[in-house]
A protein has these predicted regions:
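An N-terminal hydrophobic leader/cap segment in hydrolases
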Residues: 53-97
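Active-site nucleophile loop of the alpha/beta-hydrolase fold
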Residues: 219-229, 248-251
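Glycine-rich nucleophile elbow surrounding the catalytic serine of serine-hydrolase chemistry
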Residues: 197-207
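Short beta-strand/loop motif that positions the catalytic acidic residue
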Residues: 258-260, 265-269
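C-terminal catalytic histidine-bearing segment of alpha/beta-hydrolase fold enzymes
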Residues: 282, 287-325
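Short alpha-helix in the alpha/beta-hydrolase fold that links the catalytic acid
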Residues: 139, 252, 261, 274-286
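Membrane-embedded segments
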Residues: 100-183
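Alpha/beta-hydrolase fold nucleophile elbow
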Residues: 187-199
């Protein structure tokens, strides 16, 4: 006989009380999405926004720290002129070599005529923050016409010198290398060397002269009062701690305080109705107790006769240093 199929047992219907007691099927429990508190969503979103803003701010600080030098220094690499264009005798020089024998600095040696009146002096010329040596030929010609020897060079990052981002520390190091080249290679006594700086190079000359009291003197052509303001006045500097990120200062007021050698200040007359002698003195001038001379000059694109007259008058008054001819 064929077997009878078992009759399925009827499933009793669920009462509404089961749902009221929180019962649910396993499938329904597995498919139900978890609930997230709106408060936690708000906190997570806030943390993400703060982290993104912090990353953006830190990135801005990093970019400003890496590129702020371009607001103060404006170097160029192509040297358009040489002293030969002004009829000056000169020798290209290279010094401050690396361990591999590669020179870091390049410049020009412009000797004085053998019978020149001030041939016992050698001027180390520190050019401005803009351009390169090719833009200084007229100034170098004016110095040569005075009858002094001249060494001019490009800082690292300028002209044909080694590539590097300019900075106050590197400028000071470059100037020290140039002094060492004069004393060790050219055998020029320190007491016969005059620093001559223009624009930001004048601020550099004050710092270097303060560290080398054995030099003959220093000439400061239009030193800048607050050069680093070119960085701090940038709109981006208001968003970050620029004073902590920028190390350069070139503070002529503070650097001039320990200056112990004679100084000549050649400053352009201010554009005002007051006489020049009633104008405020340049920053750092009043702090200097050593021999000093201040001359106001009318603005001129090239060194003028008053420039030469003031320079020679100052040279005549320089005291003779031990060991100098």
């Amino acid at each position: 006989m064929p077997r009878k199929k078992p009759t399925p047992r009827p499933v009793p219907p669920l009462s509404s009380s089961a749902f009221e007691q929180g019962w649910s099927s396993p499938r329904a429990a597995r498919s139900a999405p978890p609930t997230v508190s709106g408060r936690w969503l708000l906190i997570a979103s806030s943390i993400a926004l703060v982290a993104a803003a912090a990353c953006a701010w830190l990135t801005l600080c990093l970019l400003f720290w890496q590129g702020s030098w371009q607001l103060l220094y404006h170097p160029t690499s192509a040297v358009a002129r040489t002293p030969a264009s002004a009829g000056l005798p000169f020798d290209p020089v290279a010094f401050a070599t690396t361990e591999a024998g590669v020179p870091r600095l390049r410049g020009w040696w412009i000797p004085a005529a053998p019978d020149a009146h001030y041939s016992r002096f050698t001027v180390l010329y520190l050019h401005s923050r803009t351009g390169n040596l090719g833009d200084t030929v007229d100034a170098l010609a004016a110095l040569h016409n005075l009858g002094v020897n001249v060494l001019a060079f490009d800082y690292r990052g300028y002209g044909q010198s080694q590539f590097a981002h300019p900075s106050e520390a590197r400028w000071i190091e470059d100037a020290d290398w140039a002094l060492k080249y004069l004393t060790a290679t050219r055998h020029v006594p320190a007491g016969a060397i005059i620093l001559d700086g223009r624009d930001l190079g004048a601020n550099l000359a004050i710092e270097v002269a303060a560290a080398h009291p054995d030099l003959a003197g220093v000439v400061l052509e239009s030193p800048l009062e607050s050069p680093v303001n070119a960085i701090f006045n940038d709109p981006r500097a208001r968003l970050i701690p620029a004073h902590l990120l920028v190390r350069d200062r070139f503070n002529a007021d503070q650097a001039g305080n320990p200056l112990l050698i004679p100084s000549l200040w050649l400053v352009a007359e201010p554009e005002s109705s007051k006489p020049a002698f009633q104008s405020p003195h340049p920053a750092g001038y009043d702090r200097i107790t050593a021999q000093k001379m201040l001359v106001w000059l009318k603005p001129s694109p090239a060194p003028s006769q008053p420039f030469a007259d003031a320079y020679t008058r100052w040279l005549d008054d320089l005291p003779t240093r031990p060991g100098t001819p």
